[in-house]
């Protein structure tokens, strides 16, 4: 199946009203949401982030994943995953052979102009979530040495080779979220997980025992309080912690009823993204580990 990714790119007009971008493709003579194919080795969100810039000329900050569309293109099945994305600045122009017009319209007018009914449904899904969310990314550390293969203190247990490769490939997955802070457990395996990403983004990590396993054993409410504080202060953040901690924090924040669909352990380098507004979680996304 052909894999593709795109977004509902939105902004606020000078009046404060919401606008979304739709594009005209001369090849098909249609109006659509911006999207494009996932390249080999590329994650869906990385592809969506890249395609938005290429097809609209705008940089963006990604929010919740809002829906998936499956259809046939020239007889072959194609799956497109869509995110909400806030436009930040115009940094270029699309290739006119691929996109010759970009229009910013109110959602109702955009839906009227979109050619495909599936695109109109995606706009409706976006409106259900709403704009103006910020992410808190709860990232499990990458693959570490087994406890049975390590004689030292557990807090000093490092990443194994696969974990080091995973850590090097996190940046393209999480760059679209534009986190302003990186927080981490003080365990070495967590510190090593976020190191490349932090240096690439020029962010100084904030270390905390409240996010560690031994800290969790001392005070089981500490990680929840830590994440809730980030939510209350409206800080888009990456938080690197451990498997027994992250699911429990998410369960408390979203409630048992809504947690059922994600009630499983995270594999190394997987994450749950909490999309927040006004101190509350309005959507959650499960992020798979990087392809190795």
How should each PLM-predicted stretch be described?
Residues 257-283:
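Domain-level recognition of soluble alpha/beta enzyme cores
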Residues 36, 47, 132-218, 224, ...:
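Active-site-proximal alpha-helix that buttresses catalytic centers in soluble enzyme cores
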Residues 38-64, 69-122:
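Unchanged
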Residues 15-59, 150-158, 162:
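Conserved Nudix-box catalytic region and its N-terminal flanking loop in Nudix hydrolases
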Residues 1-33, 136-141:
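N-terminal strand-loop-strand
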Residues 135-137, 233-241:
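Generic beta-sheet signal
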Residues 29-30, 92-146, 150-151, 155:
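Nudix hydrolase/Nudix homology domain
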Residues 219-235:
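A short, acidic, amphipathic alpha-helical segment used as a generic capping/interface helix at domain edges
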């Amino acid at each position: 199946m052909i894999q593709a990714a795109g977004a509902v790119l939105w902004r606020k007009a000078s009046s404060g009203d919401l606008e979304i971008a739709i594009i005209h493709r001369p090849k098909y003579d249609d109006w659509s949401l911006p999207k494009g194919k996932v390249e080999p080795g590329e994650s869906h969100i990385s592809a969506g982030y890249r395609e938005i810039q290429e097809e609209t000329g705008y940089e963006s900050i990604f929010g919740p994943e809002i829906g998936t569309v499956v259809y046939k293109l020239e007889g072959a099945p194609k799956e497109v995953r869509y995110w909400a994305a806030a436009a930040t600045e115009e940094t270029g122009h699309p290739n006119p052979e691929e996109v010759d017009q970009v229009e910013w319209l109110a959602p109702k007018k955009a839906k009227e102009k979109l050619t495909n009914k599936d695109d109109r449904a995606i706009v409706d899904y976006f409106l259900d979530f709403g704009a103006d969310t910020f992410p808190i990314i709860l990232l499990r550390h990458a693959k570490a040495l087994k406890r049975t293969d390590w004689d030292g203190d557990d807090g000093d247990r490092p990443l194994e080779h696969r974990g080091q490769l995973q850590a090097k490939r996190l940046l393209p997955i999480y760059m679209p979220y534009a986190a302003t802070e990186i927080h981490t457990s003080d365990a070495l395996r967590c510190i090593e997980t976020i190191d490349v990403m932090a240096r690439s983004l020029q962010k100084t990590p904030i270390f905390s025992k409240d996010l560690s396993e031994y800290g969790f054993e001392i005070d089981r409410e500490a990680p929840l309080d830590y994440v809730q504080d980030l939510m209350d202060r409206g800080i888009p953040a990456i938080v690197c912690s451990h498997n027994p901690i992250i699911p429990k924090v998410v369960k408390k924040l979203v409630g048992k009823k809504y947690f059922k669909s994600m009630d499983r352990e995270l594999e190394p380098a997987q994450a749950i993204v909490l999309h927040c507004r006004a101190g509350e979680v309005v959507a959650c996304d499960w992020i798979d580990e990087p392809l190795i």
